From Swiss-Prot:
It comes from the Eukaryota. It comes from Ascaphus truei. This is Skin secreted peptide 5. It is found in: Secreted. The lineage of its organism: Eukaryota, Metazoa, Chordata, Craniata, Vertebrata. Expressed by the skin glands. The keyword Secreted applies. GO terms for cellular component: extracellular region. The keyword Secreted applies. Keywords: Secreted.
């Protein structure tokens, strides 16, 4: 898993 993907998932979870 890439850092960008992990950050993206975290961003989506924030919503």
């Amino acid at each position: 898993i890439t850092k960008d993907f992990d950050a993206l998932m975290k961003y989506i979870k924030r919503i």
